[in-house]
Amino acid sequence: MEHNFTWKNDGRTKVMIGCGTRPEIIRLAAVIKRCREYFDCCVVYYNQNWDRNLSTVFWEDFELKNTFGEYGPDILVPVVGENLGVTCGNILGRSYELLSELQPEGYLVLGDTNSCLSAISAKRLHIPLFHMEAGNRCKDECLPEETNRRIVDVISDVNMCYSEFARKYLADTGLPKERTYQTGSPMAEVLHMNLEKIQKSDVLERLGLEKDKYILLSAHREENIDSEKNFLSLFTAINALAEKYDMPILYSCHPRSKHRLEKSGFQLDPRVRVNEPLGFNDYNKLQMNALAIVSDSGTLPEESSFYLSIGHPIAAVCIRTSTERPEALEAGDFILAGITTRELLNAIDMAIEMKQKGVLGKPCPDYVDETVSMKVVRIIQGYVNVVNKMVWRKG
């Protein structure tokens, strides 16, 4: 595989980080910076999200430079094929080739995307494998992410969980307790790192919006977009929301979602404004000033908890029928709304009224820890040799 990356060979541990989507760039932003500080580090991007608004803009937002001094990963690996089988095959084949060539001493992945399946290559090559966001489960087999989670959790040498819920789940399935750690979510550190930029964003002026006079929408998950029944149910509910509140609904729209809407011919209410995907700083400025946020994003519960912790609560409503973040529900940080009109309107009404009355949850401790990147690099540094000795019988 053609690339220009070479290790510095400065004596530090050689760590490769694999990712391939916008959420991974966001969640890993602080960890990548910390790894570059303490490791001989290589970041590989598998380019699942190839659109500039879903990739390039986020390297820039977080000022994530590669070893060549440019915004972006050290190695860009094209993997997207004409179908899922080809894409997953490319991820496995090309990651195996790259890992075989560069032989990192540790390989780090986060989450449940198809890019995380590159972990299989690291495992087969006996490279110590570290997994962030381990143990998350929504118990919904319709979600492709649920399959990926199980695969990567089981094969990882060290699992790093956000919450006690996740750690207990892994322990109950028989995975080694001595190599499973609760680190907390990396999102608070990422949000705090960019908070000044978020607050300075002029996105409201650029889009002609006013504080508390719009609703922010994000809907992109496969179960909401690709299922005909769920798609019609959700966007019928969105139209009803526009009718009831009679204000702009700004839809930060993923290219796949936009294509699905165009192909379906579904007529959105004129008050629903379909917008290109927004950058991290702009999107969070919009979240902080919206009357309510309606989203199927996995980061919503964590963002809601963070904003609550800094005295800026948001009315967060999740348009899903399951969640892998029960700890945030337990803390009262968001409402799980479902996707029918009745469910969504009731949830929105409740979220807005509670915010206005100051009836709030409490910040989830797992979501407001700003030392996660430090924990991650320490765990990696400490366990590379342990895994080599105890798992692979090296040395």
Give names to the regions the model predicted.
Residues D10, L98-E105, L209-E210, N289:
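Glycine-rich phosphate-binding loop signature in dinucleotide/nucleotide-binding domains
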Residues H3, E353-G395:
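C-terminal amphipathic helix plus adjacent low-complexity
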Residues Q48-D51, T56, Q199-N289, K394:
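Donor-nucleotide binding loops and adjacent catalytic segments primarily
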Residues V77, C161, R273-E276, I335-T340:
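Short acidic-hydrophobic, aromatic-tinged amphipathic segments that line or gate anion-handling sites
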Residues L108-L110, C116-A119, H131-M132, N159, ...:
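A donor-sugar binding/catalytic signature common to diverse glycosyltransferases
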Residues E2, Q48-N53, P78-V79, V152-K229, ...:
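A nucleotide-sugar donor-handling region in carbohydrate enzymes
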Residues K14-C19, E24-R34, Y38, F58, ...:
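Active-site and donor-binding regions of nucleotide-sugar-utilizing enzymes
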